Regions:
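Ubiquitin-like/PB1-type beta-grasp interaction modules and other compact soluble beta-rich domains
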Residues: 1-79
Length: 80
């Protein structure tokens, strides 16, 4: 199944692009998609547990993915 990951801020800078498409086995979870992305050398700094939104709704990392899903990785917010 194909899942589109949307990258913002520092995640976009590390990847050099604003989205990545992953081909994952059926029944994969958001955590497994993130693990696959972290295996890329330029994305190894990515937290194993970033905030995520699945199809524009905040979701837990245990959320099951389906073909065509959009998974947004939300970077930490800093500042004051």
């Amino acid at each position: 199944m194909k899942v589109r990951l949307l990258l913002f801020a520092q995640y976009r800078e590390w990847a050099g692009q604003d989205e990545v498409e992953l081909d994952l086995p059926a029944g994969s979870t958001a955590a497994e998609a993130i693990q696959r992305l972290r295996a890329e050398p330029h994305m190894s700094r990515l937290s194993a547990a970033p905030a995520i939104a699945l199809n524009q709704v905040y979701a837990p990392l245990s959320a099951a993915l389906s073909d065509g899903d959009e998974l947004a990785l939300i970077p930490p917010v800093a500042g004051g």
